[in-house]
Amino acid sequence: MVAHDPSQAVVRVDGLSKSYGRVRALDDVAFSICTGEILGLIGPNGAGKTTLFECVAGLEAADRGAVFFESVPVDGQRRSTKLFYVPDGITPWPEQPVSWVLDYSLGFFAGRRGIYQQVIADLALSPLMRVPIRALSKGQRKRTLLALGLLAPQPILLIDEPFEGLDLRQSREAAATLRKHLTPDRTFFLSIHQIADAAKVCDRFVLLSGGRVVAEGKLDTLTALARQRAGHSLPAAFEEVFLALT
């Protein structure tokens, strides 16, 4: 896993806040995303993870705050040239087969054709290429969405719940695929609620609770912070660290 160097931050999120009526979904959220890393956004259901992804991607307008790319503020429209967002639970072009969806996406986004066959093999999509998207199981659809993301040309890939719908073996294979396709000029930002999966694939973590960032850092940094806050030693398991900090 890569080491974190603050000087290598490719994206900086500064003071993002978002409310829906009287409900504060995000409250002064700030963190950095570094080039060539897998950053995990970790939080319980309802913590604001999806809202944060949508605001960072420019799909939702934040009430205040800014997103910087290489120290330059970037508005919502221009973010699409830098960020590619893969939402959870969507069914793109449901009547079309997997092969059509991937080929169309490659052409529309000017995607990474050089890794097309490798991504298909890594995500075991070959048997599904002629199957309509609507006929896929939840796990099969998730693997197709992961392929769409990996083939996108943007340097920063945001994936909401990359392991949702996958069994244990598939989750491990998906994590290995993400790690395999991580390059020095590419960054993956993953929203995950499965703590065990996050600990295995991510280099650093942003912990979100109640719409606020409660901690950010590598696992050893978060473990030390959790022990300091708890006032006593804690097991090394990420689950215990997460519970202590949130």
Positions of the model-derived regions?
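Hydrophobic anchor residue at the start of the ABC signature
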Residues: 146
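Catalytic Walker B motif of ABC-type/P-loop ATPase nucleotide-binding domains
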Residues: 157-161
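Conserved ABC transporter NBD signature motif
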Residues: 65-79
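Conserved ABC ATPase "signature" region
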Residues: 103, 113-129
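Helix-to-loop junction immediately C-terminal to a conserved catalytic motif
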Residues: 57
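The feature captures the beta-strand-to-loop junction immediately N-terminal to the Walker
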Residues: 42-44
